[in-house]
């Protein structure tokens, strides 16, 4: 299932991301804000557990997410603000990291680092800013599936139809929650209109 959350607020935030004047600090902040909206939508029907807490009225029980049953995984480095946003909302969630680099000539992706916690029987939330060709995301999903995750949810800020179709073809069971689906990929496999290089813009490494 692919769900696009192209609401007026999200469209306004995405427009700010597209602006070339938006600096790294502001860019990361907007990415985190959009991620919180995506997370809320992705988990709106998630099961809850009872939690007994001390309040100003004494001991009381409330329904909450079982944070230990979730893992958030980011594809370095553009996805780091998204991971931070998820962990700010769910501070007891476990986190994992994948480093996948795209060959600019072949446009194929290559994994060069992975650090994942125990995923068996858990819901894994994969976060990445852009879904272009879908190669990196398919690789990430393949890796997480070997860890016997119960369910995988993908959160993306923007994506191209070609990449979404590629992921759906390889992983038809995948749930993707995305804030904006852009027009297409150009001849260099960049998303149009896109955001530019999200990692460079987040961390001020644009040459």
Region spans (language model):
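PRPP-associated nucleotide enzymes
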Residues: 1-207
């Amino acid at each position: 299932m692919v769900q696009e959350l192209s609401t007026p607020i999200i469209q306004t935030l995405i427009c700010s991301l597209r602006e070339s004047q938006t600096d790294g600090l502001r860019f990361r902040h907007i990415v985190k804000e959009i991620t919180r909206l995506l997370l809320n939508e992705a988990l709106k029907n998630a099961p809850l557990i009872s939690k007994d807490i001390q309040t100003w009225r004494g001991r009381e029980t409330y329904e909450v997410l079982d944070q230990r049953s979730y893992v958030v995984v980011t594809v370095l480095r553009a996805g780091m603000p998204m991971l931070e946003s998820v962990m700010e909302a769910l501070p007891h969630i476990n986190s994992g990291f994948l480093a996948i680099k795209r060959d600019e000539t072949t446009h194929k992706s290559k994994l060069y680092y992975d650090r994942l916690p125990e995923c068996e029987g858990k819901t894994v939330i994969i976060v990445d800013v852009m879904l272009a060709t879908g190669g990196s995301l398919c690789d990430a999903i393949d890796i997480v599936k070997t860890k016997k995750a119960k369910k995988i949810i993908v959160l993306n800020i923007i994506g191209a139809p070609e990449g979404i179709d590629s992921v759906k073809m390889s992983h038809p069971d995948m749930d993707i929650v995305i804030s904006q689906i852009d027009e297409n990929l150009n001849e260099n496999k960049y998303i149009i209109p896109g955001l530019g290089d999200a990692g460079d813009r987040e961390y001020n490494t644009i040459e």
